[in-house]
UniProtKB/Swiss-Prot annotation:
This protein's record includes keyword Repeat: yes
Top-rank lineage group of the source organism: Eukaryota
Record: residues binding Mg(2+): 349
Lineage, uppermost ranks: Eukaryota, Fungi, Dikarya, Ascomycota, Pezizomycotina
Name under which the protein is recorded: CCR4-Not complex 3'-5'-exoribonuclease subunit Ccr4
GN (gene name): ccr4
Similarity comment text for this entry: Belongs to the CCR4/nocturin family.
């Protein structure tokens, strides 16, 4: 994206219907989109711009000729030129040419508000579909802005003020019948636009950033001089109508829209989109350089990989079919895991089949051992069906750590087993039905004797169930507290030798391994270093976040909505750990989940600050790269989430060292 390929377009020199290998394309499912009713307050807001080209525009400009001079040409070699798709093009183009007077659309809205009958325009298409399953919410934020449209039509504009692109709340923008020769790349800032009219200008091309406008339903380009379209228009998966008549568009693109309509052309551009240059590597942000060479360090990676069953065109319609294919994405995921070489890896949304048949085997070559549990729904399923159920997988370096214990926490099942669950309807009706889990492993460093509790969790996603996410978090912390007290009494490890292959004939004797230190015993559970990773589907400042960060939450918290969850909703929620978010050291990342409709922080690596200190972090994704990428997954990021990766130093141990009996020793 940062190199020459970023400006590559579909030029006329490319052969018609060039053949490329692609995975079968999934049928696109519509997403829900709400159109706001435009009232009379939308009119005459052009006075908001007091300087620049917008202010100097004259309201008396009327085009004296049609752009390009050939708005009715249809290539002779294209059949069915009068099918329904092209008939719509001609009809909309005719309507566009009649709208050449100044502020035509704003005046039409005003006339409608006064009850004056005007010629009807093409109705907006209302589509219904399912929301995505990842993220805190996909609903549009409530805006205090009273108007959402601007009409600069018929003004004779030759340039656009940069101030215009600060109006990110705009949903409709009319720039038709002016004298614009180019559209600034900053058009990509107006990501809420559903209607953009650029008809009747002198445009010869569109910027790649047009692909950022993924909410577009209508894009009118009638009567310009456009010969080709940027591949990035393939991101416009919601686009219903592309008005292109009156442009000398090249034959291949014109054939698609004439014969099959807008959707077919957008799909073609999406599937034929070249792989752009990758972004620069994410920076390794060093926070503490004071640690000595002898200081014990541990690295941890957390990653929601987006399971195969969730990576559908209905949820990720902007992504090419190949990008969504699991065979492609799993290779990228594996490559990233290997490149970081983290001591501990916590993966969410890994299905059973992928764990058993791919990741466990592949990561074994890199010294990893794994612990895995699927979500609760896998119980009772046929073996083949259960393979598609996702869960949480925790990997650790086998040469560095000993697995002392592993546990599954099923939030719903744990809740109904609580003594105070009787008569608490919300536990059964809201919480028990959700089968989200956490996986806990208890590890010991073979050489240093330090022990670690590692938690890998995935909470429920739906923003309408804030109470469920909060109670899942409370149960998680309650169960970790119980386990930590058990682990504080765990006996010393007596066998720390890592497996070693016997030397082959002719090989020199390897130096003997360093004598391992005895196991460290901890006086209480909250003294054991704790690392808690996962997709909590909760933003900073949410109830779930605050409970983890502050150690307590009041029973009257509004997220509980006065629902009944036993003692958790009667006396409140607490935990004894002093936890901090690793990325809180840099004010958190701009996002950990990135899609066209949602960009926020959902994923975390929490650590016990009394026993661990964060020393380095993997930084954010390059900002320039994101200017032309509306959402993940794509060819460089295989999930809608990004990986978190942190390095910690182990603080001085507050427990006492327990000498383990290693048996007879050689002198």
């Amino acid at each position: 994206m940062n190199g020459g390929q970023a400006h590559q377009r579909f030029g006329m020199q490319i052969p018609k219907f060039q053949s490329q290998n692609h995975h079968p394309h999934h049928t696109q499912q519509p997403h829900h989109h709400t159109h706001h009713n435009q009232a009379s307050h939308n009119i005459n807001h052009q006075h908001q711009f007091s300087s620049g080209a917008l202010a100097s525009a004259t309201p008396h400009f009327t085009p004296s000729h049609m752009q390009n001079g050939a708005h009715t040409n249809v290539d002779e070699d294209i059949d069915d030129s009068m099918n329904e798709h092209w008939q719509q093009q001609l009809q909309l183009a005719a309507e566009s040419r009649q709208a050449n007077s100044p502020h035509y659309h704003a005046r039409s809205v005003a006339q409608q508000a006064k009850g004056i009958q005007i010629a009807p325009s093409q109705p907006d298409t209302q589509e219904q579909g399912s929301d995505g399953q990842n993220g805190v919410g996909k609903t549009k934020a409530v805006s205090r802005q009273g108007w959402h449209a601007l009409d600069f039509g018929g003004q004779g504009l030759r340039a656009l003020s940069t101030s215009l692109f600060n109006y990110v709340f705009l949903e409709k923008l009319y720039l038709n019948h002016n004298k614009l020769k180019s559209l600034p790349p900053t058009i990509g800032h107006l990501r809420k636009l559903s209607h953009l009219d650029l008809s009747g200008n002198d445009l010869t091309e569109l910027p790649d950033e047009i692909g950022m406008l993924t909410n577009l339903r209508k894009l009118y380009l009638f009567d310009n001089n456009i010969r080709t379209l940027p591949y990035e228009m393939g991101y416009l998966y919601r686009l219903d109508t592309l008005g292109i008549e009156g442009n000398p568009l090249n034959d291949v693109l014109k054939s698609h829209i004439m014969k099959e309509g807008t959707k077919a052309l957008i799909k073609y551009l999406k599937e034929e989109m070249p792989v752009h240059l990758p972004p620069p590597d994410r920076d390794w942000v060093v926070l503490d350089e004071t640690a000595s060479a002898s200081t014990e360090k541990i690295t941890v990676l957390s990653y929601n990989t987006l399971c195969d069953s969730s990576a559908t065109q209905s949820h990720y319609g902007y992504a090419p079919a190949r990008v969504l294919s699991w065979e492609f994405r799993r290779e990228l995921i594996l490559s990233e895991l290997r490149s970081h070489g983290s001591d501990i890896v916590c993966l969410q949304e890994i299905d059973q089949g992928s764990y058993n048949e791919y990741f466990r085997e592949q990561l074994a070559y890199n010294d990893y051992k794994g612990v895995y549990w699927p979500r609760g729904r896998a119980m009772g399923m046929q073996e083949e069906d259960a393979k598609g159920v996702d869960g949480c997988a925790t990997f650790f370096k086998g040469s560095k750590f000993i697995l002392l214990d592993k546990q599954l926490i099923n939030f719903g099942q744990t809740a109904v087993r609580r003594p105070d669950a009787k008569g608490q309807d919300d536990i059964y009706n809201r919480l028990w039905q959700k089968d989200h889990i956490a996986v806990v492993v208890f590890l010991e460093n073979r050489q240093t004797g330090s022990r670690f509790i590692v938690v890998n969790a995935h909470l429920y996603w739906d923003p309408a169930f804030k109470d469920v996410k909060l109670i899942q978090t409370a149960i998680l912390m309650e169960e970790i507290t119980k386990l930590s007290e058990t682990y504080a009494k765990w006996p010393a490890c007596t066998d720390k030798a890592a497996f070693r292959f016997s030397k082959e004939e002719g090989q020199t004797e390897a130096p003997p391994p360093e004598e391992p230190a005895p196991s460290v015993q901890y006086s209480s559970g909250d003294q054991i270093p704790l690392l808690m990773c996962g997709d909590l589907n909760s933003s900073p400042g949410s109830a779930a976040y605050n409970l983890i960060a502050h150690g307590r939450l009041d029973e009257e918290h509004p997220d509980l909505e006065k629902r009944l969850y036993g003692n958790l909703s009667k006396v409140g929620m607490t935990h004894p750990f002093k936890l901090k978010s690793a990325y809180g050291s840099i004010g958190e990342l701009p996002f950990t989940n990135y899609t066209p409709d949602f960009k926020d922080i959902l994923d975390y690596i929490w650590y016990s600050s009394n026993s661990l200190h964060v020393s380095a972090l993997l930084g954010e994704v390059d900002k320039d790269y994101l200017q032309k990428v509306p959402g993940f997954p794509n060819y460089h990021f295989p999930s809608d989430h990004i990986a978190l990766f942190a390095e910690f130093t182990v603080k001085g141990k507050k427990g006492k060292v327990v000498e383990a009996d290693f048996g007879p020793q050689r002198n």
